[in-house]
Amino acid sequence: MEKVTIVSEIQPPQNDKERKTRERVACFLKHPNEEKFTLIEKQYGITVPWWWIEEGESLEQAVEREIKEEVWFLHIKKIKNLQITIQLERYEQKQDLNLHSVSHFFFAELFDLEQQIWEFNVIWEEKEAVLSKITPQVIKVARNSFAKNLDIKHRKELIKRS
């Protein structure tokens, strides 16, 4: 398993603050009939689908649950752990604590496009477009916390493993 740990240069952890760990799954979700992957458009930008893991839930269970709950696709063909984990250490001013975010990356393929109601605008893109579009948005979402440290090698590795 490849692990990348990034310490924010913009919001570095503070020695005297409580540390809270949050784990989440991020998923490269493949279209059932085309070589395209989904992006979701949220209020802060475009990203791959990602979600917090609930207590007592396995990583795979979180991926399956959230695909159904958040992007509303009903039939998942397969889920594969990409064995890549990105850990981000930063100070969260709003909560006045150090936040340790652990993101586990997955690939999932849909059986079909049957879905329920849309919560997000889902965009289907080819691998290269996903790589080019997600990078600025991930950086924005993380408030530039790891922009200087997450190099192109790691972004390409995420796409390559899916």
Annotate each PLM feature:
Residues M1-A26, P32:
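Acidic, metal-coordinating catalytic segment for phosphate/diphosphate chemistry
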Residues K20-R22, P32, N98-S101, I117-E119:
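A generic fold-level signal
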Residues F73-L113:
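Active-site segment of metal-dependent pyrophosphate-handling enzymes
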Residues H104-F107, E114-A147:
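NUDIX/MutT-family hydrolases
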